[in-house]
Amino acid sequence: NVYTAIPLSTESGVRTVNTIRYNRFNTTFTGGVGLKADYDEVFDYALGAPTVNKGNLNQTLIIMVPNSTDYGGICQMWEDGSAIAFCPQSTYDYPLDTRGVIQHEAGGHGFGKLGDEYIYHNAFIDACDCSCCGHVLEFNGAKSLGWYDNLELTGKMHSVGWSHLIFDDRYSDIVDIYEGGYMHNRGVFR
């Protein structure tokens, strides 16, 4: 089931560290492409949808479209399966447009529980000491929840989660293993 809701705010826009906006869920940019909100208030609001209840809220993907065209999106995911995908409007061309942001954040992360495949750092994941993204501990935590089936910390063909596709004649000329993912160009395979 898909439901659309348009909660009203006192003001239009998204808060920043320098700007106060009185919006419905206290949606705030946290730097870079980060977004946060009053998550409890968001979940309480979602409980107003006809078939959503406390027993299935953690199986309900919530997509928020903040009233902003500042590019970026993020999907907050909780261990119980709950997810809120923040997908601001975008004026860029596909795949960076609004549709692409929704596909990536809501479809890829919130629904599919897939990990990011792009690269920020020219470093091995287990040697990187940056503070801007997750590393092996966070990666393994997500894997223990059954997430990130598109990523592995091994490049062994028979050990990756998609090995059945690599060795299937219908896909063997398309599916392979590539190094780089989860923001690191080494030590993560997609």
Protein language model features and the residues they cover:
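Active-site-proximal segment of zinc-dependent metalloprotease catalytic domains
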Residues: N1-H121
